[in-house]
C-alpha cells in the first residue's frame, strides 16, 4: 500500500534521492517515484497528478525539479482542495552547483490557499521531506 508519491522533473534529479529513499526504506515506507516534466510533458504530468487522487491511501506528495522548479507548484495547484500535504524541493542540475534564487522563490511564494512546504534543496532538502513524510505516514 503506497502512502507516499514522489514526483521529480527529470531523471537527472535521481542522484539527489539516495539518502531520502534509504531513510524511507529503513522506516519501511513504500513509495512510488514518477519522473514527469511540467514543461516538456504537461499532459503526462497532469494525468499523473490526477491519477494519484485515485489512490485513497495517499497521504503525502514530495515533488522536486531543477531549473524553473515548476513541478511542486503545479501539483499544489491541482491538489489545493485536498488534505494531502505537498513538500517541494529545489534541485540543481548537478551536485555542487549553486542555487538559482528565482526558482527557489517560486517554491516559497505560492499564492494564498495553495499550500506548499519548501524543505530545502538537493539531497538534504529531499531527505528532510522524506523525514517529515514519514512522521505524517506513521501517525
What do the PLM-derived regions correspond to, one by one?
Residues 19-22, 47-49, 75-79, 101-104, ...:
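Short, glycine/charged-enriched secondary-structure capping and boundary segments
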Residues 46-91:
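Glycine-rich phosphate-binding loop
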Residues 13-18, 42-45, 67-75, 96-99, ...:
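Short glycine/serine/threonine-rich phosphate/pyrophosphate-binding segments
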Residues 3, 59-60, 115-116:
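Residue-level preference for the first positions of well-ordered beta-strands
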Amino acid at each position: 500500500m503506497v502512502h507516499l508519491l514522489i514526483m521529480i522533473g527529470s531523471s537527472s534529479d535521481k542522484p539527489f534521492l539516495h539518502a531520502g529513499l534509504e531513510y524511507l526504506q529503513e522506516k519501511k515506507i513504500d513509495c512510488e517515484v514518477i519522473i514527469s516534466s511540467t514543461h516538456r510533458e504537461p499532459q503526462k504530468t497532469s494525468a499523473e497528478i490526477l491519477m494519484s487522487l485515485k489512490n485513497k491511501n495517499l497521504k503525502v506528495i514530495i515533488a522536486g525539479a531543477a531549473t524553473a522548479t515548476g513541478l511542486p507548484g503545479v501539483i499544489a495547484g491541482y491538489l489545493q482542495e485536498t488534505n494531502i500535504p505537498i513538500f517541494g524541493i529545489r534541485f540543481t542540475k548537478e551536485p555542487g552547483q549553486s542555487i538559482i534564487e528565482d526558482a527557489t522563490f517560486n517554491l516559497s511564494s505560492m499564492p494564498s490557499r495553495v499550500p506548499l512546504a519548501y524543505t530545502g534543496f538537493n539531497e538534504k532538502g529531499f531527505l528532510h521531506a522524506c523525514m517529515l513524510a514519514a512522521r505524517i505516514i506513521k501517525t
